[in-house]
Amino acid sequence: MRTETDMVRQDEVWKGAALVDRFLDGVRGGIPFAAEQIDVMLRVVAACGAPVRRVADLGCGDGILTRALLAAYPAAAATLVDFSEPMLTAARARLADRVPPPRFVAADLAHSVWVEAVADRAPFDVVVSGYAIHHLPDARKRTLYGEIGALLAPGGMFVNIEHVASRSGWIEAISDAAMIDSLHAFHTTRGAGKSREQIADEYVHRPDKAANILAPVEAQCDWLRALGFADVDCFFKVFELAVFGGRRPA
């Protein structure tokens, strides 16, 4: 796990097409409970009961979360933000058939300037993020959550599907084993022929591992509460995979 004292940003690896292709083709489909995480996101958004007219997807990757939101709210205007051009290219392809067409924004969540790039589309009824914010130092995570809160409409919902820190190395090892088992099952289903040992070696030595700055979900929920979010909770958690968030008070 990377610490905040590191001087060199490690998440720049996600700007490379090779890593993006490897993740989208060989990893993302093997994430445990991925469908359930998206279902939880949609249920929480629906429970707010307010019209969903504008949505933002931060660290959007290939747009999988936006695709799910627009399937439920087809008239919504979507804004997708990522600093990785290969990810944005994949998102454009995934969402090419959407009307109204989404806006794709190349911006870095590590710096507050991203807010200026989306401010004209605010306020947002829903802001989501999936497996992106854990690349930021904790101080920046907290600041980003405040920026998100300021961009939400009254009653608007923020949902973060995220890789979070375990409380001990023992729990982390269980989480890693579960992830490796899930990836192995995914590749076996595709007929890839990789052994569990090969999958484990690739997972342990993956090039993006150093980019992770994980924080406990409990701490992140506390940050949201301190920033004024309401109804903050962890809605789903299996080992290091969590869905959490809160609402801007109406």
Where would I find each of the regions flagged by the language model?
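Core SAM-dependent methyltransferase catalytic element
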Residues: 230-250
